[in-house]
A protein has these predicted regions:
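Short-chain dehydrogenase/reductase
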Residues: 2-97, 111, 121
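Active-site loop of short-chain dehydrogenase/reductase
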Residues: 15, 71-72, 99-100, 145-159, ...
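Conserved Rossmann-fold SDR core element
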Residues: 34, 99, 186-211, 249-256
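Substrate-binding pocket helix/loop in short-chain dehydrogenase/reductase
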Residues: 114-115, 119-124, 174
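A short, exposed helix-loop element centered on a Lys and neighboring polar residues
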Residues: 138-139, 190
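Catalytic loop of short-chain dehydrogenase/reductase
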Residues: 154-198, 210
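C-terminal helical subdomain
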Residues: 183, 198, 205, 223-273
Length: 273
């Protein structure tokens, strides 16, 4: 999406999107993609400025990309491990642009530690951010979506929800709790899709596969055995965009691998970059 500019009459004109974990990687790419189609995007993460994280990328960077392309976006710094911060995020997002039409649950905190030594505090933190954080934000945005009989919720999952990376020997050591979190999110998404179907709200989960992001680099998940599986962040962003713009009566309750989804619907990777 290098050099992309906003389509003033895009398919998301008039929509408000809230994207968590939007300071880098998948979240940043999703925020930019939605903004390119006219959505007003609220970006949130813990890192707003350089020097606040060991990883590259900030909310300020994401907002600059969007605004430089002619889009509308703002950021709200928040720690999604805290309920009061999630509530403040929702209030400030609505104050900025109005009720949320699209919620993208992408925020995550991840520790790869063998299960026999996994600390309870870190387990609780992962569940709080990835699982309960997504549920709580959904609780906050749902009343507005129900009132308008319209909305889309997308959660970022992982193939680890089903099994670790193959071959098993030496692959993704300590990823059991991460996989548990993602499995919980997938079951949550399919269950919620059933609950809100009559309200014209779609709920789906996207499994990105291995993606070239700063977080993946830190955990050293890309090596000579896995490099052929790596997808660009633009694929995931495009899959999210395609999902939130389709008929919610037909496109809901799905768990899709991003690249396979794009192929199924006739969108090729070459069209995304």
């Amino acid at each position: 999406m290098a050099g992309a500019v906003v389509n003033p009459n895009g398919t998301l004109k008039g929509k408000v999107a809230l994207v968590t974990g939007a300071s880098r990687g998948i979240g940043e790419a999703v925020a930019v993609r939605l903004a390119m189609e006219g959505a007003k995007v609220v970006c949130t993460a813990r890192t707003s400025e350089e020097g606040e994280s060991r990883l590259p990328g900030t909310l300020s960077d994401t907002i600059k990309r969007i605004r430089d392309a002619g889009g509308t976006a703002t950021f709200i710094k928040a720690d999604l491990s805290h309920g009061p911060d999630r509530e403040r995020l929702y209030r400030e997002a609505v104050a900025a642009y109005g009720e949320i039409d699209i919620l993208v649950n992408n925020a995550a905190v991840t520790f790869f530690i063998p299960i026999e030594t996994f600390p309870e505090k870190r387990f609780d933190l992962m569940m709080e951010v990835q699982v309960w954080g997504a549920v709580h934000l959904t609780q906050l945005v749902l009343p507005g979506m129900r009132a308008r009989k319209s909305g889309a919720i997308v959660t970022l999952s992982s193939g680890a929800a089903i099994h670790p990376l193959k071959p098993y020997a030496g692959a993704n050591p300590g990823g059991t709790v991460y996989g548990m979190c993602k499995a919980a999110l997938e079951r949550y998404s399919t269950g919620l899709a059933s609950e809100v179907y009559e309200d014209n709200i779609s709920v789906n989960a996207i499994s990105p596969g291995l993606v070239a992001t700063p977080g993946v680099a830190v955990h050293k998940l890309i090596n000579e055995k896995t490099i052929h599986r790596v997808s660009p962040v633009e694929n995931i962003a495009e899959a999210v965009y395609q999902i939130v713009t389709r008929d919610p009566k037909k496109m809901t309750g799905r768990i899709d691998h991003a690249t396979a989804f794009l192929v199924e619907h006739g969108v090729t990777a070459s069209a995304l970059v």
